[in-house]
Amino acid sequence: MRFLIVILGMFSTLAATAEETRCGWLENPSPANMWLIDRDGSWDISVQGTSNALDDKSMELLYQATANENEFVRTNRSYGFSCACLTVDVDEEKSSITTIHKSKQLPLKQCLEDISITKDIPLPFK
């Protein structure tokens, strides 16, 4: 019986840290502020003035999702937003992304045509 409880506990831990793919607006409006807005809401990645929980590999993958200047909208000098899919681990309780495993910048058109996030386009004047 104890063995079964231990095994179930191990599987629940694995499920809690399972990778998931989230796609939406990847917003970087100012230094050290970055989040992803998808159909489920806003996911904090980095917030100025708080400790950054992401490792260097995650940060590199994150910036790859904004690398194509033709699919990046500048809203504040070199800051702005793109459309991206990130394969991540999340802390659902804090609505934050804790690790990034993969990233892919998408055409802006893809987010514009996604009715679940079109209204959330991160334009400063809307």
Describe each PLM feature range.
Residues 1-4:
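Positively charged n-region of N-terminal signal peptides that target proteins for export
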Residues 12-14:
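N-terminal signal peptide c-region/cleavage motif recognized by signal peptidases
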Residues 18-71:
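N-terminal secretory signal peptides
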Residues 58-126:
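Beta-strand-rich cores of mature extracytoplasmic or soluble domains
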